[in-house]
């Protein structure tokens, strides 16, 4: 029996473990394809166009914005990043599921354009644990950590836009819950091509 492809969106506050969960899901979940973003930043050593990112120049990216070619896009410092609509739709139309790991603002943009997606909010067990994770990864200044924690409280206000909440207290337990969500969504009648 054929079924429609499903867009699975995981998002949550910075430092909650989205990247770790994404990698584990892709490693262990059959027929789950990663959404590839477009960016104007130069490719780093070892990055491959079409595998890590779609690398485009500013003019091309702006043209794609004008053509409504993105499910979402954002400017991060001097670079632009976006999720190409065509890439995602092509996979979905071929019955392939797509996983998109994104920040909360991006997820809200995607929800507007693709409300049929499955939106999963990843949340820490508490703010103290999130602070510990942010400090432990050693990538952020104290000011940045405090700003991220303040943003986390604000981001919780958007929880109603999501279909599921998964608390990432233990990576294996969170992974098990997301896997259960994927299995259940794949079995829903609305996602099956019955004719």
UniProtKB/Swiss-Prot annotation:
InterPro entries, alphabetized: GK/Ca_channel_bsu, Guanylate_kin-like_dom, Guanylate_kinase, Guanylate_kinase_CS, P-loop_NTPase
Class of enzymatic activity (EC top level): transferase
Residues at which ATP binds: 12-19
Guanylate kinase-like domain location: 5-183
Keywords: ATP-binding, Cytoplasm, Kinase, Nucleotide-binding, Transferase
Segments passing through the bilayer: none
EC number(s) recorded for this UniProt protein: 2.7.4.8
Example of a GO cellular component annotation carried by this entry: cytosol
Main location (coarse class): cytoplasm
Subcellular location, record wording: Cytoplasm
Keyword Metal-binding belongs to the record: no
Any GO molecular function: guanylate kinase activity
Protein origin, superkingdom: Bacteria
Reaction(s) catalysed by this chain's protein: GMP + ATP = GDP + ADP
PROSITE patterns, per the entry: GUANYLATE_KINASE_1 (PS00856), GUANYLATE_KINASE_2 (PS50052)
Family recorded in the similarity comment: Belongs to the guanylate kinase family.
Record-linked NCBIfam families: guanyl_kin
Function: Essential for recycling GMP and indirectly, cGMP.
The name this protein goes by in its record: Guanylate kinase
Gene: gmk
